[in-house]
Amino acid sequence: MKNWDGYFMNIARMVAESNTSCIRRQFGALLVRNDKSIISTGYNGAPSGVKSCGERGFCYRDVNKIESGTRHEACYAVHAEQNALIFAAKHGTPTKGAVCYVTAKPCSVCLRLLVQAGIAEIIYDKDYPEAWEGYEDIAAIIKMRKYDQK
């Protein structure tokens, strides 16, 4: 039996590794239908047409000593999950009932967007430093689990 979780998580990792626009972190996300077909991929980076941190040679968050998992508005990068949802929407591809494979646990902003987009399950590879206080109700309505490599 094929290990679909491993297969799709490896693709999400490859998407993250191909990201050269963010100096600080590389995240990848993948949206997958129930029939195991890939809807879209996304990685964290600057919006289209905007110079990335890699191109500028510095990270605004690093320069201003902003901790990971805090003050998301201090960076204009689009998160991997957000990009995956945006690319699906741009191409008119429904996401309701899909699974999101992502290389790190979604931040609270991405969690809300994934719930609103009808994602049925989130499978993440690593923990993310953001505290989720107050988001228990939102997290309770979407299936979420950490990827198990066993």
Feature locations, PLM:
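Zinc-dependent deaminase catalytic domain
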Residues: 1-150
